[in-house]
């Protein structure tokens, strides 16, 4: 028999518990997608015909997003809402390195150092090109070819900038079929060697090549993919961690949820139950998966509002930001090649807000637990 006091106490407990559970904690596995910019009319809030197969994305702490549009050989700039930012009246900046398509930009980094100078000024943004060249932008309507001669036989699909021994270096992921490696350049864009055995996994898997490289918390994370001669990928993949001098640290993750991994992003604490996790974007199946940043253990995949994993046609960079015009610091920004890489999409993912009815169900569930506990106590 429940007295009025019993029911009142249970109700108070249920309310306290329900209110203490944030919507993010309850529904963090579901995310809302907002399409900001696309080359396809009507697909996003803004249209830009230059956004064709964007791969890398780079930015300074306050700058717009800079896109590496591989299939238009350009970079385009957008704020956090997708508004186009023109440079000197130019809607796009040309990236040299050869014709568009097979030679356009892939990986990209922001350069905040005084090195990597072109024409007497530091290149503020640096691009790796698919044909093994590197370009840099110092101003104006076009970037400058920093390495006039392509690295022989190289296919650059990723780029990182890091410091080692007081000097700054560029690290390019060369994903050439069966012979891929990490190529290193000094701050004068000259190729250098960090020593025999650098960027070598003692237990590397046959047929896998470096697909991308990214600096995370002072170490270089290299994503490996099993690629075919035409550049298409097979299922599988792994991620290694290296020091900036090229020494192998450990295998972070392997197989399982990885499918031609490429993009990396460390989630902020506000990103629901995935807060603080390392997110890895698969180019192979277009999924975004979360991993424990210390152990590399797989945690889960980002789901859409239908409860199914979000999947993209040709997923590349994913990024969080802490500043910038119209930037949502709680959003995961992503870029995707669509329509067989003849189109592009720039969007954001945010933790879905649960419906009021769902919250009521939770409260009733907590109330039920409270009643059951009271029965056991009074039995």
Where in the sequence are the language-model features?
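A short, hydrophobic C-terminal helix/tail in secreted or cell-surface proteins
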Residues: 355-373
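Sequence/structural signature of beta-propeller domains
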Residues: 28-352
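N-terminal secretory signal peptides that target proteins for export/translocation
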Residues: 1-9, 378-379
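Membrane-interfacial segments
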Residues: 213, 376-377
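Sec-dependent signal peptide recognition
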Residues: 6-16, 358-361
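Short linear Ser/Thr-Pro motifs
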Residues: 11, 22-23, 38, 358
